[in-house]
């Protein structure tokens, strides 16, 4: 072997493999270093690929020092941008007819190679240069180098791996081969059709020579492996194709192809499609030969039997390819095969389109646009090529191997128009010609500044957020009911069942408040303003289980209400019977359930006032009093929570006053003692029931805190925590006698300054009233027989009893009855005025229910006096 001999090693599928590698890296988001964003979505790509295919991106990215810039494009449709990126990585793309104009406009703005007018003009100029070169050198040898291929009968030099082919090249001193002045007719017709589709020239012979010379310049090193290596020239897994017939004995070579297409063919070629992919590609060989000798497939899964017409039996001289570099001819024209359904390109088949279109979370976004009808059309129509490249009659650039949109919910496209406006605020148009400005890694082409936006991480979530907002707006009434339902814990304990309070013969039904036996949950539920528990919900429940639970709770409420009605009726019948004291005390009637209805500061201190609607004897009054104690004891036993137990205990302590017991005992023989004294029926009525309530009210029992669970062993006061109990004992009971003590409220202070401040704030204007009501005749407790208020109320009771006695006797003088009535009315007016004029007593009375008791006392007294002397009592009551 001569020392001057060299060997050329060729990777047959080099271009397709490189483009496939770039696409695989993009699919895996490996080494991506730029993000294109528009309409709130983003696509990740490689800067080197974008720069190689677009001068616009090359200039923009060259001036950007950022490691991973984000380019925001305004007035660019995301579907067009996605199709452009697919075109850059594949070399071809399918575009819907409705989107073709906007796609070409976007490609022209971004100056994508192969799709712009400037690119077509450059291609025409290069072809003209090639034509002139071919005309000048077509009859002479183009190069002194020769390319020798072994005869088919002498075996193959192709290696077993199929990745390279061995060629021998002689030195410059070897004799030149004979010139080849012409080409076979079938290759000439093939190339003539290509040239005619590009520039529609009538010079067929010149086009043949030009295209053939162009092929020789770029493809002189291409060769076809011999028949001995069957199917070894391809590195893909394309489906099996019919074997070819025997080839000619002379060396064969394929015409070169210059497309920069990426084909999914290196290990995962899917089944071929039925449609021809004439796009911006040629025959798909990527300038590297067919890749097999007898073969299964070429570089992109195209059958070799369809390409027999493009093979030449004669050897070609090597051209000066190093001196001439042309733009790819097949970027703008097709091979125009007669059989339009035999050429297949597997780079955008259904499976891969499905993978790419569903990779919205992978950084490239999903193939979707604001026009839903574009997706629904199926993308089945053919598309015309731009007029500046070729006419629609000659070729259709974008055939309808449709994009696949698997499982795209139309609701996912909600809010897209709002995203257009949002993304429009982030960037300016790239048509301004500026290379862009860098703001924290965000490039805003054509503008001086913009808002930094993490488009690569945040923009993909806008559709789902807008959709969720709309769904929440539509279902807000239903969710409101569901929140109100789930905010309150449900339980089956009887203490939480709603009840309707009854007082006497009337019912106190409230539509805004639930009555739930004084629990925290009932208070929180009533504060929410939910509808009455007795009625059904107007809004449908979310699940069947919820309906079932509601029905069960409704049945429980009905049964509870029935039981309460029976108890209340039995209780009223027991009260009407004068001697019915032998039966055990029933459970508490429904009127006790209004502990939970009223606020804690307005708990009424009279719970047996309905007994006054009946005619009470001494035994009946005593029975009512005993029944009240039994009811309280039963309620304490049934109290389910510490709060309920505490308030029931507080209520029982308020009801057990010594003045009530004394007045009940003093009125025991009132009706049997005859007329003329306080022991008569009127005195029995007022002293046994009303005086008890007045005495309870005058004790000024303020409501206890909710969490009071620690009792002082000295004064019996309930405190919330051990620390407050300790401080209470230290300040109230363990201080020395000479410390500062308030003489009005008996509160102990640590310093005299604190005592003076306390008096100036709380007792400056209330001293006289406080001492008048609460400190009389050496007795300091309000409600005791020595206090002024108790004396006034006692005189009121005595006057009322005397008036009632005079009316019942009937033989007394009218003047005496009138005088007693006037005296009773005056006493009532004075007592009420004194009570209301005192700030401390008045406020405490309102807080503890005293005002209600006083007004009821005055109303009962007015009704009684109007029966005896209505003309005299009415002016006094008007004064009140």
Curated annotation (Swiss-Prot):
Compositionally biased residues, Gly residues: 281-298, 667-683
ZnF (C2H2-type) residues: 710-733, 740-763
Induction: Induced as a primary response to 20-hydroxyecdysone in third instar larval imaginal disks.
InterPro entries named among the record's database cross-references: BTB/POZ_dom (IPR000210), Dros_DevTransReg (IPR051095), SKP1/BTB/POZ_sf (IPR011333), Znf_C2H2_sf (IPR036236), Znf_C2H2_type (IPR013087)
Keyword Nucleus part of the UniProt annotation: yes
Compositional bias of kind Low complexity: 227-238, 453-466, 473-491, 655-666
Subcellular location: Nucleus
Location of region: Disordered: 135-185, 218-378, 425-601, 617-686
GO biological process: autophagy; cellular response to ecdysone; compound eye photoreceptor fate commitment; dendrite morphogenesis; dorsal appendage formation; eclosion; follicle cell of egg chamber development; gravitaxis
Highest taxon listed in the record's lineage: Eukaryota
Name of the molecule in the record: Broad-complex core protein isoform 6
Organism whose genome encodes this protein: Drosophila melanogaster
Name of the gene: br
């Amino acid at each position: 072997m001569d020392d001057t001999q060299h060997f050329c090693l060729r990777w047959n599928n080099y271009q397709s493999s490189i483009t496939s590698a770039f696409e695989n890296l993009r699919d895996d988001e490996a080494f991506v270093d730029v993000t294109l964003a528009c309409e709130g979505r983003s696509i990740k790509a490689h800067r080197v690929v974008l720069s190689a295919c677009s001068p616009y991106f090359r200039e923009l990215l060259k001036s950007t020092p950022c490691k991973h810039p984000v380019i925001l494009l305004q007035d660019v449709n995301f579907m067009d941008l996605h199709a452009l990126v697919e075109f850059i990585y594949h070399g071809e793309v399918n575009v819907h007819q409705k989107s073709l104009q906007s796609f070409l406009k976007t490609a022209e703005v971004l100056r994508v190679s192969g799709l712009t007018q400037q690119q077509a003009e450059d291609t025409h100029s290069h072809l003209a240069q090639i034509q002139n070169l071919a005309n000048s050198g077509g009859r002479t040898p183009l190069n002194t180098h020769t390319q020798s291929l072994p005869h088919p009968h002498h075996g193959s030099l192709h290696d077993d791996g199929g990745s390279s082919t061995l060629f021998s090249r002689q030195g410059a001193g070897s004799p030149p081969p004979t010139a080849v002045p012409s080409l076979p007719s079938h290759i000439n017709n093939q190339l003539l059709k290509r040239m005619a589709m590009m520039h529609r020239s009538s010079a067929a012979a010149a086009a043949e020579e030009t295209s053939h010379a162009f092929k020789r310049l770029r493809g002189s090193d291409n060769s076809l492996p011999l028949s001995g290596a069957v199917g070894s020239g391809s590195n893909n897994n394309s489906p099996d194709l019919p074997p070819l017939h025997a080839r000619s004995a002379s060396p064969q070579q394929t015409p070169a192809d210059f497309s920069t297409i990426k084909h999914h063919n290196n290990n995962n070629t899917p089944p071929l499609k039925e449609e021809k992919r004439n796009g911006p590609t040629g025959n798909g060989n990527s300038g590297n030969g067919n890749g097999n000798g007898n073969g299964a497939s070429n570089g992109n899964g195209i059958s070799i039997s369809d390409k027999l017409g493009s093979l030449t039996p004669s050897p070609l001289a090597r051209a000066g390819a190093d001196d001439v570099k042309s733009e790819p001819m097949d970027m703008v024209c097709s091979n125009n095969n007669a059989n339009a359904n035999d050429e297949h390109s597997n780079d955008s088949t259904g499976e891969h389109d499905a993978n790419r279109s569903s990779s919205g979370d992978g950084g490239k976004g999903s193939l979707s646009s604001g026009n839903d009808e574009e997706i629904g059309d199926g993308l089945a129509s053919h598309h015309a090529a731009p007029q500046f490249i070729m006419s629609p009659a000659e070729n259709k650039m974008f055939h309808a191997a449709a994009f696949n949109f698997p499982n795209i919910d139309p609701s996912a496209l909600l809010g897209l128009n709002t995203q257009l406006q949002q993304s429009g605020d982030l960037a300016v148009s790239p048509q301004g010609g500026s290379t862009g400005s860098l703001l924290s890694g965000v490039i805003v082409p054509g503008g001086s500044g913009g808002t930094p936006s993490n488009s690569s991480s945040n923009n993909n979530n806008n559709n789902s957020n807008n959709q969720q907002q709309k769904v929440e707006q539509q279902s807000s009434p239903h969710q409101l009911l569901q929140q109100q339902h789930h905010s309150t814990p449900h339980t089956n304990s009887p203490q939480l069942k709603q009840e309707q309070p009854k007082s006497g013969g009337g019912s106190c039904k409230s539509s805004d408040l639930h009555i739930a036996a004084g629990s925290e949950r009932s208070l929180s539920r009533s504060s929410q303003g939910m509808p009455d528990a007795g009625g059904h919900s107007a809004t449908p429940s979310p699940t069947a289980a919820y309906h079932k639970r509601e029905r069960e709770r409704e049945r429980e409420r009905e049964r509870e209400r029935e039981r309460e009605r029976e108890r209340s009726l039995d209780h009223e019948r027991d009260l009407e019977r004068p001697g019915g004291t032998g039966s055990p005390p029933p459970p508490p009637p429904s009127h006790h359930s209004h502990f939970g209805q009223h606020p804690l500061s307005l708990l009424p201190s009279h719970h047996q006032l309905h007994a006054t609607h009946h005619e009470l004897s001494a035994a009946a009054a005593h029975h009512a009093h005993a029944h009240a104690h039994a009811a309280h004891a039963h309620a304490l036993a049934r109290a389910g929570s510490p709060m309920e137990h505490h308030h029931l205990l507080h209520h029982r302590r308020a009801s057990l006053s010594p003045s009530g017991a004394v007045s009940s005992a003093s009125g025991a023989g009132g009706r049997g003692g005859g007329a003329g004294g306080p022991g008569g029926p009127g005195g029995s009525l007022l002293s046994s029931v009303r005086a008890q309530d007045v005495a309870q009210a005058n004790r000024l029992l303020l409501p206890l805190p909710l969490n009071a669970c620690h009792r002082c062993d000295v004064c019996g006061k309930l405190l919330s925590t051990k620390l407050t109990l300790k401080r209470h004992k230290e300040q109230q009971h363990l201080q020395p006698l000479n410390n500062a003590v308030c003489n009005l409220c008996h509160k102990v202070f640590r310093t005299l300054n604190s005592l003076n401040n306390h008096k100036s704030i709380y007792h400056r204007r209330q001293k006289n009233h406080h001492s008048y009501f609460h400190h009389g005749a050496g007795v300091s407790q309000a409600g005791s027989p020595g206090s002024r208020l108790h004396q006034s109320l006692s005189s009121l009771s005595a006057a009322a009893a005397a008036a009632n006695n005079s009316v019942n006797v009937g033989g007394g003088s009218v003047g005496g009855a009138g005088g007693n009535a006037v005296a009773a009315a005056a006493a009532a007016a004075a007592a009420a005025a004194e009570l209301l004029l005192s700030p401390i007593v008045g406020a405490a009375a309102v807080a503890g229910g005293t005002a209600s008791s006083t007004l009821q006392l005055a109303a009962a007294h007015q009704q009684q006096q109007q029966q005896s002397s209505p003309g005299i009592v009415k002016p006094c009551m008007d004064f009140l």
